[in-house]
Structure formats: C-alpha cells, structure tokens
Amino acid sequence: MVMLHSKNVKGFLENTLKPYDLHSVDFKTSSLQSSMIITATNGGILSYATSNNDVPKNSINEINSVNNLKMMSLLIKDKWSEDENDTEEQHSNSCYPVEIDSFKTKIYTYEMEDLHTCVAQIPNSDLLLLFIAEGSFPYGLLVIKIERAMRELTDLFGYKLG
C-alpha cells in the first residue's frame, strides 16, 4: 500500500506550477495559478500549491483564496463526474484519452469564468489531478503539462481512499 507523504506531494505540485518556455518559437506561458490533488468521490482537496506567494499566511485573503479553491475543486469534480458518465462528451474537443504505462485515463479541459482548467483521474485511483491557469494559457499546453505530470505519479496509480 502506498502512503501519501504531504511534503513530497506538495513539492511535486509546486514543481507543476512552473511556466513553459518554448525557445524554438519564442513563446513563454505564465505559471499555473494552482495545482491540486483532489478526491474523485467528493472533490475534497488533499493537497494544493498556488503560485500566488504575495498573500500573507493566515490572512483573510489567504482564507478567501483557499475557499475559492475548494469551490472550484467541487465544481470541476462534478463536471468531471458528469463527463465520465457521458460517452458523447468523451468524443468532444475537451476530452483527451491518454495511455500511461498501459493504464488509460482521460484529460478534460474546462473554462471557468476567465480561467482555464484541466483535470484527469490518476489511473484506477480515487484521486484527480487538477490544474488551474490564466485564460491566456493554451489548452493544448495544459493537456501536455498534466499528462507529463501524470507520468510522474505512477506510484499513485490504483490508490484508493479509506
């Protein structure tokens, strides 16, 4: 049985926030706003990292920011759950089936207000990996970024809660 170590998970999520810098085409993205591991059952946040380091710890702004993340994770989890059960949605432009080490999963992209989001179930687990980026962050790069991140989470494939 694999145990989640919060320091390792937090470090991983912080690394996923880094921007893309494509030298060959002179293109650089902003950092992700947030990276989270949430439960597929109820959308609860297990761990998260944000790129907004300007917010003082334990301030009202930090509390509001965390509350916003909680609300967004619930909304995304509900949308993901709907789409997982809707075979038509799985053939849309916002669903990207991927295979990682013979495990299959689907990456979904969504727009929430002025943000781009990307979510994927860690294969055969009760966990979702969720990225939130500015609206200018290209969906295609967001999908590539989450797929590469998933390849680093193979120890969590099959992870079940409780």
Swiss-Prot record:
Molecular function terms, GO-annotated: identical protein binding
Organism superkingdom: Eukaryota
Note: Present with 3490 molecules/cell in log phase SD medium.
UniProt record, GO biological process: endocytic recycling; microautophagy; positive regulation of TOR signaling; protein transport; signal transduction
Name of the protein in question: Protein SLM4
One Pfam family it belongs to: SLM4
Membrane-crossing residue ranges in chain numbering: 127-144
Subunit organization: Component of the GSE complex composed of GTR1, GTR2, SLM4, MEH1 and LTV1. Component of the EGO complex, at least composed of GTR2, SLM4 and MEH1.
Primary residence: membrane
Subcellular location: Vacuole membrane
Protein task: Component of the GSE complex, a GTPase complex required for intracellular sorting of GAP1 out of the endosome. Component of the EGO complex, a complex involved in the regulation of microautophagy.
